[in-house]
Amino acid sequence: PPFFFLIGLWGIGSQRREAAMKYTLFMLAGGVALLLAITLLAANHAFQTDSDIPQGLSFSLPVLLQTALPDNEQKLVFLLLLFGFAVKAPLVPFHTWLPTVAMEGPTHIVAILVGLKLGVYGILRFTMPLAPTAAAEYSWVISLFGAVTLIYAALIALQQTNLRRLLAYASVSHVGLVIVGIASLTMQGVQGAIFQILNFTLIASVLMLISGFVHHRLGSTDEIHLGGLAKIMPRLTCVYFLFMLASIGIPGTSGFPAEFLIIVGALTVNSALGIAALMGAILGAGYMLSFSRRAFLGPITHPDVKQSHDLQLRELALICIPAVLILTFGFFPDGILKMNHVASEMWLSRLTTPSP
């Protein structure tokens, strides 16, 4: 895949080739599971319609959604799809490729991998609608995956001393929060999950870009090199804190309505799941605020910081549109919620009354 070469050839770490190989092997494992699941779905459609193979194989999503799937096969398809997308999301325990790539890969590639939640989208768009009975029966498995990912990644993030690795674990933890919202099977939870997918695509990507700006200036994103950044880089610090506060769900930013809806949806279904979501949000605030205080505030602890310079105009311009969006979505979330309301209703109806 292209990312193998992008990470292996243009990564910033000494272990970039190993990181590229690790990423590729993980993606291959997930891809094989997805291929098997899709092949089973297509073969089942051919069997149901008495069509010849391979001529009768159909990979059209609307067709597959309308094709009956026996319970045993549906459970197998569900598990294969869940595993494949859990690797790509990633969910614990399939997450180890992301922190490695975050430390070794080029910033622009890591920003894409951290920001885009294609694995979560796959679970929402394909795994549960294609196997609705199994998804409803085993929603507790998805809830467990989400809660463990949310809490475990947050606890690991609390111990990090490097900004890039911290952001990688924060991304994994937020994936867990989104999965908790999806698994709640409530309107609030699903709407919050969709909102959070869009929300964290903006926030995580920009935070990783900011870490790239810091690395370009100082040659490191470890906290031992970062103390007192606010004194030398006030513009970078202001932008960083805006997106950092959005990532922990401060009111007035897009993170607040998304996290609030997920927590409400989880509490509606199961108090333990809701408490897990709430604890994940609290831990998220803990690791982000703690690291930010050490890295940006306080005295300057490294001589390279004094010789550095603040964000340039073109760098600020790159961040301007996402900053406006997270503030707009924070103060006026109704637009996003109205847009995904109908889709959320249709998705939930598919799970509560599976067809055919």
What spans do the regions from the language model cover?
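Membrane-interface alpha-helices at helix entry/exit sites of multi-pass transporters
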Residues: 19-22, 105-114, 221-238, 273-280
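Alpha-helical transmembrane segments
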Residues: 94, 160-163, 214-229, 291-310
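Membrane-interfacial loop-to-helix junctions in multi-pass transporters
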Residues: 68-76, 106, 137-148, 229-239, ...
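Alpha-helical multi-pass transmembrane bundles of energy-transducing inner-membrane proteins
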Residues: 1-73, 156-222
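Predominantly late transmembrane helices and immediately cytosolic-facing juxtamembrane segments
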Residues: 92, 204-208, 274-307
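Helix-coil boundary and interhelical linker segments in multi-pass alpha-helical membrane proteins
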Residues: 124-138, 178-198, 265-273
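Short helix-boundary/re-entrant hairpin motifs in multi-pass inner-membrane proteins
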Residues: 19, 75-144, 168-169, 235, ...
